């Protein structure tokens, strides 16, 4: 079975280094002229799939914006996932789950088991209970060709108080996460399947992110304040592994399909220039 790292590497080579989020929050639904209900949610998601599903390497639905409508919202999420995969995009479900034992194993089955209606290519997870507690998620990903993105250095300013705190051994909490994920990805070619979430807004990290040997999801671009040019400052020699993530910067162009595509093309061009220097 082909690994997620290999599939992501190929998707980026074919479609370019870009992840676009699907974040149907009330303000954006209103901007699109849609009601803040499950029907508006469905129209929003279907439009994004139509516009971007066959041209963007990775699409990242934010699960919370679907879950807030209960079972009907989750049904829309299931449909969105199916449509995106049929269109050829890799689906990264933003859930930021984190737990222990049988519970994290259940999360792994929900998102990474091919028979699940919520089966996606990769998920985001939180390491606050310890990176080792996420082992069932990593194991399922390895067995089923899935991917996992672990929060490390996030774009929200509140994160620094925890992530840059130092452990008894002198390493920052973020460095502990980086080191453990680096070990998981050791020797993987062309890219490991366990990635990190590293915000594009955080400036120089002081960490060797190239050693991770896995994909580096970079949120915080566009509406959150970072530009594609900031990627060079944050990631340095790790630029080849960076997957820039935009949401509002692209989605604000909707609901017109052509405008959404043009917005995605524009930020992709910015990302290519920043990542390659051309």
Curated annotation (Swiss-Prot):
It catalyses: orotidine 5'-phosphate + H(+) = UMP + CO2. Keywords: Decarboxylase, Lyase, Pyrimidine biosynthesis. InterPro entries: Aldolase_TIM, OMPdecase_AS, OMPdecase_type-2, OMPdeCOase_dom, RibuloseP-bd_barrel. Pfam families: OMPdecase. It is an enzyme of class 4 (lyase). Its EC number is 4.1.1.23. The active site is at residue 96. Pathway: Pyrimidine metabolism; UMP biosynthesis via de novo pathway; UMP from orotate: step 2/2. One of its GO terms (molecular function) is orotidine-5'-phosphate decarboxylase activity. The keyword Lyase applies. GO terms for biological process: 'de novo' pyrimidine nucleobase biosynthetic process; 'de novo' UMP biosynthetic process. CDD domains: OMP_decarboxylase_like. The keyword Secreted does not apply. PANTHER family: OROTIDINE 5'-PHOSPHATE DECARBOXYLASE. NCBIfam families: pyrF_sub2. Belongs to the OMP decarboxylase family. Type 2 subfamily. This is Orotidine 5'-phosphate decarboxylase. It comes from Salinispora arenicola (strain CNS-205). The lineage of its organism: Bacteria, Bacillati, Actinomycetota, Actinomycetes, Micromonosporales.
């Amino acid at each position: 079975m082909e690994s997620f790292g290999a599939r992501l590497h190929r998707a980026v080579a074919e479609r370019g280094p870009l992840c676009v989020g699907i974040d149907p929050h009330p303000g954006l639904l209103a901007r699109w002229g849609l009601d803040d209900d499950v029907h508006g949610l469905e129209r929003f998601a279907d439009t994004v799939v139509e516009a971007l599903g066959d041209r963007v390497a990775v699409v990242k639905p934010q699960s919370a914006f679907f879950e807030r409508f209960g079972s009907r919202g989750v049904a829309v999420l299931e449909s969105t996932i199916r449509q995106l995969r049929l269109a050829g995009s890799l689906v990264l479900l933003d859930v930021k789950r984190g737990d222990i034992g049988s519970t994290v194993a259940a999360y792994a089955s929900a998102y990474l088991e091919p028979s699940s209606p919520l089966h996606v290519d990769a998920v985001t997870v939180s390491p606050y209970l310890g990176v080792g507690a996420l082992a069932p998620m990593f194991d399922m990903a390895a067995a089923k060709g899935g991917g996992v993105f672990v929060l490390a250095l996030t774009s929200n300013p509140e994160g620094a108080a925890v992530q840059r705190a130092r452990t008894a051994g002198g390493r920052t909490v973020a460095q502990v996460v980086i080191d453990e994920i680096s070990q998981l990805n050791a020797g993987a070619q062309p890219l490991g399947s366990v990635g990190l979430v590293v915000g594009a807004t955080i400036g120089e990290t002081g960490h060797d992110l190239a050693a991770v040997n896995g994909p580096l999801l970079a949120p915080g671009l566009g509406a959150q304040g970072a530009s594609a040019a900031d990627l060079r400052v944050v990631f340095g020699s790790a630029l080849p592994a960076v997957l820039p993530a935009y949401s509002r910067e692209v989605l604000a162009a909707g609901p017109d399909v052509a405008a959404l595509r043009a917005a995605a093309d524009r930020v992709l061009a910015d990302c290519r220039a920043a990542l390659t220097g051309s």
